[in-house]
Amino acid sequence: MRSSFIFALLLIGAALAHPATDPIRSKRAVEVVEDDFSGEASGEASGEASGEFSGEGSGEGSGELSPEVEVTPLTISQLETLNNYAQQVQAEAQKLIHQANFVITEMTALAANAQNLGIMSSIVSTNSQIVLDSARLSLNETETETGNTTTVAPPTTCSTSAVCYSDEGCGSGKCIGALAGTCNCNSCVYGWPCQEDSACGGFIGACNTITATCDCFNAYAKHNMTLTDAFTNFCNVAKCNGGEDNVENCHGLPCNYGFCVC
């Protein structure tokens, strides 16, 4: 009995002296070591991977997709220059608008004058043959030649619808026409294309060779007339007889005519 007790004590002492031989304790130690190793390995791997991928991905991606653009700010002087240029362009545009309106107005006036000329041309064309025939029959001309001069006596008989500039041209009849025997300023149409004064109704000095258009107002000034003088003392007022005195009295403009009523 005593020997058995001593043997048991020896076994207990051996177990205490060598704890690693305990299977339960050794198993627990192995599990703790494996847990430490796996924690350190996973922490380092995830930290390095996430750091490298997130750093490289964000750096490279942002650099390639969003390049920096340099913006040069405008100075005050440059802004003032742009503003002045814009004002000049606006002023030029206003001038062009005014010029366009002026051209439209002039074209409207020219169209009206052309229509009036067309009407007058139709009337003259219709009556020209009648007038010529009447003139041949009614005019009793007596010519007295003295050297190079020729005297034409007025007709003594009246021919209906014959062209006249005064009652003397109708014999015993009357020359009907409110403006007959006066200078016709309407023959000069302002702005009408011309190469010479004949296109401006014969008004001497009316054709502007620079613009190639009729400038009737300037022609009045050339003959020492203001617009007031022209409209009150010259146009449809100055006397003429449809002959050579048109050049002197009417400055080349034609003479208004009427028709004889017998």
Curated annotation (Swiss-Prot):
Q: Does the keyword Hydrolase apply?
A: no
Question: Cross-referenced InterPro entries, in alphabetical order?
Answer: Cpg-3 (IPR039260)
Q: Which parts of this chain are annotated as the region Disordered?
A: 37-68
Keywords from UniProt, A to Z, are: Glycoprotein, Proteoglycan, Signal
Keyword Signal assigned to the entry: answer is yes
Instruction: Tell me the first and last residues of the signal peptide.
Output: 1-17
| UniProt feature, compositional bias: Low complexity | 39-53
UniProt-annotated glycosylation sites, renumbered to this chain: N140, N148, N224
Q: In terms of domain of life, where is this protein from? A: Eukaryota
Q: What is this protein called?
A: Chondroitin proteoglycan 3
Q: What is the lineage of its organism?
A: Eukaryota, Metazoa, Ecdysozoa, Nematoda, Chromadorea
